[in-house]
A protein has these predicted regions:
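Short, Asp-centered acidic motifs that coordinate Mg2+ and/or phosphate
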Residues: 42
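Short, surface-exposed beta-strand/loop micro-motifs that present aromatic residues
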Residues: 166-173
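Extreme N-terminal starter segment of soluble prokaryotic enzymes
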Residues: 1-5
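Short acidic low-complexity segments
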Residues: 27-39
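Pocket-forming structural segment of enzyme catalytic cores
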Residues: 90-165
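Acyltransferase
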Residues: 180-202
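Cysteine-nucleophile active-site neighborhood
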Residues: 49-119
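Short hydrophobic segments within beta-strands
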Residues: 7-9
């Protein structure tokens, strides 16, 4: 039986996620349609690019409402990555479409004349609230690539922050909903540990 469902939105490449799971010897199910979901109540939702195309891609495959129902009613745990994390919120300044609304906040664009946007490269996370996602992680540097973010460093759902122009939420959690703005699949051993922790401890 698969240990995890990986949503293939059609926007972005899931190859890096698959390689990490192969390295960790986890069985997984790639989700292209609602019928593909296994009974394993864990979902990874990776995403890159822009907000609206990402949401539209999920809707075109009839995945958006199904994911919403699985998370809210059947209590599947979900880990959103990059744009996947942003989609967990109400909306984004980048687009017009609503997100899943699992988290009551919106995504905003970095605003700075001193820093280059997008924020691309390695940056440090500062853990604000104990969470199993960070268990056994010593190196706190992760790889980021984004122009929009969640500027809510003091909100209860924020479990780690990072500074780029200002503090932002680099990892979030509320009940069975988890999100990371960085790319764990591109962050070497510490990123692998994030994915392992989600699968094993969620």
């Amino acid at each position: 039986m698969p240990k995890i469902n990986i949503v293939k939105s059609g926007v972005g490449n899931i190859g890096s996620i698959v390689r990490v799971l192969d390295d960790l010897n986890y069985k997984y199910k790639i989700i292209n349609s609602p019928e593909d979901f296994s009974d394993t109540k864990k979902i990874i939702l990776p995403g890159v690019g822009s907000f609206d195309p990402f949401i539209n891609s999920l809707k075109s495959k009839n995945l958006f409402e199904v994911i919403k129902e699985l998370v809210l009613k059947k209590k599947y745990s979900i880990l959103g990555i990059c744009v996947g994390m942003q989609s967990l919120f109400l909306e984004s300044e980048e687009g017009l479409l609503p997100g899943f609304g699992f988290l009551n906040y919106k995504c905003e664009k970095f605003k700075s004349d001193k820093y280059k946007v997008p924020h691309i490269g390695w940056n440090k996370i500062f853990i604000k609230r104990k969470n199993f996602l960070f268990d056994e992680i010593e190196d706190k540097f992760f790889y980021f690539a984004h122009s929009y973010t969640v500027l809510a460093p003091t909100k209860e759902f924020t479990i780690s922050t990072t500074n780029y122009t200002e503090d932002f939420s680099s990892a979030v959690c509320n009940d069975n909903v988890y999100g990371v703005q960085f790319h764990p699949e591109k962050s070497f051993d510490q990123g692998k540990q994030i994915i392992k922790n989600f699968i094993e401890k969620c």
